[in-house]
Amino acid sequence: MFGFNFEEMLLGIPGLIIAMTFHEYAHARAAVSLGDFTPRLMGRLTLDPRAHIDPIGLIMLFLVRFGWAKPVMVNPSNFRQPKRDDILVSVAGPAMNLLLGFIAFYIILFIRTHNVDVSSITYGIIQMIFVYNVNFAIFNMLPIPPLDGSH
């Protein structure tokens, strides 16, 4: 049921770190640009994965296919238009994942259509970046608290 594939795990680590880091960074960047400086004050306005990755959540993703990152804390009362801005901050993470997924997809497409010589490891990592980002975007838009789609 919970198959464990060591090769998939190794190829997936960069994809998961990229997906989680950019997802949470997008929330932080959106919040700050909309007037809430809480993420900046908490050190979350960075692409340093250590600010965004919860080690236990990352391990759980591999072991049971369900995990988490450190959520970006925001204070909606700091927003200019709290209801609208809260939604925009929530959508920023999945939107970033979709963008990264499309970029990875087009890199894969370019490699395949132009017969670019890349190692199987590099190709596998790019594939996992695509898979994890698209899955994160879809999953996070489910209307279930605390996911982004519940806002």
Predicted regions and their residues:
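Hydrophobic transmembrane alpha-helices and their immediate loop junctions
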Residues: M1-H151
